[in-house]
Amino acid sequence: MLAKRIIPCLDVRDGQVVKGVQFRNHEIIGDIVPLAKRYAEEGADELVFYDITASSDGRVVDKSWVSRVAEVIDIPFCVAGGIKSLEDAAKILSFGADKISINSPALADPTLITRLADRFGVQCIVVGIDTWYDAETGKYHVNQYTGDESRTRVTQWETLDWVEEVQKRGAGEIVLNMMNQDGVRNGYDLEQLKKVHEVCHVPLIASGGAGTMEHFLEAFRDADVDGALAASVFHKQIINISELKAYLATQGVEIRIC
């Protein structure tokens, strides 16, 4: 059995790490490189960086900090933000990123997933999915351009259909960003994760809602996700990564202990 992964997420805007609640009202957390170094030293399995306004601004991720991160950490990291071409991806990977993640650009042009997978291999192509639960209809819908609340829009895709579509096109991993739970710290949406897991045949990463160590355990034990991504509990030092991993190990979760 592959070890489960603990993945801190760093949302980047204007060269700094920020964090919002349900993708809104972002506050500044701190500088990118020191935070990345701290999480690597605490035992994170990998890091994810989202340049959250790149797609809505019509630009690619700011590459200046990618190489600086690569110099100070020795764990894999993934970068996302406005990657719309093979050239964009090649530059980011050449600066030291191990994976690239696409979200809004994939919705705008689904063929991008296949072109990236064919060029760089499925192992480094992650598709992020921003999913919102509509209580009135009882359905999960995919959102686009979520980094800018004034431009966020609901797409025609229901979440489960999009999960299946991106796999057909070559996604090597899926990060499910559950917008209703984002930053609230009341736990992952286990029901949604279970539904997605049924149709997902590539590694599935849960994102949005972690508030306690038990929430991570539930995601691994009850929804059988491959990794759990979180931000605010790590940024605000509510949970220490090494302590989290020790706890998960005592609960029988296969996890890499530093």
Curated annotation (Swiss-Prot):
<dbReference type="GO" id="GO:0005737">
    <property type="term" value="C:cytoplasm"/>
</dbReference>
<dbReference type="InterPro" id="IPR004651">
    <property type="entry name" value="HisF"/>
</dbReference>
<feature type="active site">
    <location>
        <position position="11"/>
    </location>
</feature>
<dbReference type="InterPro" id="IPR011060">
    <property type="entry name" value="RibuloseP-bd_barrel"/>
</dbReference>
<keyword id="KW-0963">Cytoplasm</keyword>
<dbReference type="GO" id="GO:0016829">
    <property type="term" value="F:lyase activity"/>
</dbReference>
<comment type="subunit">
    <text>Heterodimer of HisH and HisF.</text>
</comment>
<dbReference type="GO" id="GO:0000105">
    <property type="term" value="P:L-histidine biosynthetic process"/>
</dbReference>
<dbReference type="Pfam" id="PF00977">
    <property type="entry name" value="His_biosynth"/>
</dbReference>
<keyword id="KW-0456">Lyase</keyword>
<keyword id="KW-0028">Amino-acid biosynthesis</keyword>
<comment type="similarity">
    <text>Belongs to the HisA/HisF family.</text>
</comment>
<keyword id="KW-0368">Histidine biosynthesis</keyword>
<dbReference type="GO" id="GO:0000107">
    <property type="term" value="F:imidazoleglycerol-phosphate synthase activity"/>
</dbReference>
<dbReference type="InterPro" id="IPR013785">
    <property type="entry name" value="Aldolase_TIM"/>
</dbReference>
<feature type="active site">
    <location>
        <position position="130"/>
    </location>
</feature>
<comment type="function">
    <text>IGPS catalyzes the conversion of PRFAR and glutamine to IGP, AICAR and glutamate. The HisF subunit catalyzes the cyclization activity that produces IGP and AICAR from PRFAR using the ammonia provided by the HisH subunit.</text>
</comment>
<comment type="pathway">
    <text>Amino-acid biosynthesis; L-histidine biosynthesis; L-histidine from 5-phospho-alpha-D-ribose 1-diphosphate: step 5/9.</text>
</comment>
<dbReference type="InterPro" id="IPR050064">
    <property type="entry name" value="IGPS_HisA/HisF"/>
</dbReference>
<protein>
    <recommendedName>
        <fullName>Imidazole glycerol phosphate synthase subunit HisF</fullName>
        <ecNumber>4.3.2.10</ecNumber>
    </recommendedName>
</protein>
<dbReference type="InterPro" id="IPR006062">
    <property type="entry name" value="His_biosynth"/>
</dbReference>
